[in-house]
Regions:
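Charged, compositionally biased non-catalytic regions
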Residues: 1-15
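Short low-complexity stretches enriched in small and charged residues
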Residues: 11-21, 129-134, 292-301
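Extracellular adhesion/carbohydrate-recognition regions
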Residues: 15-101, 186-250, 305
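Short aromatic-cysteine micro-motif
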Residues: 45-170, 201, 253-256
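Short catalytic/ligand-binding loop motif for oxyanion handling, primarily in non-cytosolic enzymes
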Residues: 70-71, 111-114, 177, 185-188, ...
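Short secondary-structure boundary/capping segments
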Residues: 118-123, 183, 192-195
Length: 350
């Protein structure tokens, strides 16, 4: 990887950024944007992806390509079999291993990408049907020679411009991407603003960094009365669309065999009388002006459930940059789950 320019694509917002060992990743620069500019509320407030350690940063960097892991570090480089069979904790580790500023993509960072895609009227496509797009089947990437039987991952960035949005390739499909957010017994929990970008932030199951969300958007200790939660509207069942955002779990499932919730993200609603704060829309955990057909959202409300997003090569019309899966534990390791790393210069929030 000595000729770094060979890694670059054509997008003007791409930059090559080196880790603390001088190894490059192709990154996409995302400038500061405000919530009102994205159609979220009326306040001219920075999107939370640009607030770190109570400082407003002028830009962030996200991976252009689904990452590959080399020497226990995550890299954004083209023409690679995407990293897969990786747990949440391992995904966090291989990003932190790159040095200060490097981290697993956060809920805030995915959220700003989703909302920018919406604001620009983009409709990204990707590998959603065994190496091809499920509708435009003439669009395809290069199948990975490392695929096991009946797995159809494509090499990073080989799907062409139609599989790119805002300079980011494969945000839809190929493999799901771990993102820093979770449910605990249905309660939505995040790391405030973009503080998960701070090096070695504790993202463990028992970390005090996790916060729950009230209806007014304030962040509080998990378990506080009245926080926002995913809950079924009746008895849990497999792939039921009967669920909403509420403040009290009334239909908690007792085990995974009780099923899971699944519906188009654009149809997600709140229980009558529950107010959805702008922060959920900013993080793409609740639709703002979203159309349907941009991905499904899934959940279970028993135990800790970490988030991955985007869909995979077998998800068809269920994939999309709005796709979000809250039904697996942090220990899950699948051939269809990988990651994006991200980077923010620590000098910007020191």
């Amino acid at each position: 990887m000595s000729n770094y320019e060979d890694l670059r694509g054509a997008a003007a917002n791409e930059e090559i950024i080196l880790d603390d060992q001088g190894i490059p990743s192709v990154m996409v620069k995302v400038p500061l944007v405000y919530l009102d500019e994205l159609g979220i509320g009326s306040a001219h407030t920075p999107h939370p992806a640009f607030i770190i350690n109570d400082k407003v940063v002028p830009y962030i960097y996200v991976s252009k390509y689904i990452n590959v892991i080399k020497n226990n570090r995550a890299y954004s480089i083209p023409n690679q079999d995407p990293a897969n069979c990786i747990t949440f904790d391992r995904a966090v580790e291989v990003c932190y291993n790159k040095g200060a500023g490097w981290h697993l993509m956060t809920a805030a960072e995915w959220g700003v990408l989703h909302n920018l895609i919406t604001a620009h009227g983009l409709e990204p496509r990707g590998n959603t049907n065994n190496g091809r797009h499920h509708v435009k089947t003439y669009e395809h990437g290069v199948l990975s020679p490392q695929n096991p039987t009946n797995v159809y991952r494509t090499l990073t960035g080989t799907g062409g411009k139609a599989w790119e949005a805002l300079g980011v390739c494969d945000i839809m499909g190929d493999v799901h991407k771990w993102v820093v957010a979770r449910l605990v017994d249905g309660e939505i929990q995040i790391i405030p603003n973009n503080n998960a970008a701070i090096h070695k932030t504790d993202l463990g199951a028992n970390s005090k960094a996790w916060k729950a969300i009230l209806q007014d958007g304030s962040l509080v200790a998990p378990g506080t009365n009245g926080t926002l939660k995913f809950d079924y509207t009746g008895n849990p069942a497999n792939a039921t669309s009967g669920f909403h955002i509420t403040t009290t779990v009334e239909h908690k499932q007792t085990d995974d065999g009780a099923g899971y919730g699944a519906k188009d993200f654009g149809t997600l609603t709140a229980k009558s009388g529950v107010t959805i704060p702008d922060i959920l829309k900013a993080l793409a955990l609740f639709p703002n002006t979203d159309k349907t057909g941009r991905g499904f959202i899934y959940f279970r409300n028993n135990g800790e459930r970490l988030l991955f997003r985007g869909g995979s090569c077998g998800n068809g019309g269920l994939a999309g940059e709005a796709n979000g899966t809250f039904y697996n534990p942090r220990s899950i390791s699948l051939v269809s789950v990988g990651l994006f790393s991200a980077y923010v210069d620590p000098a910007l929030y020191a």
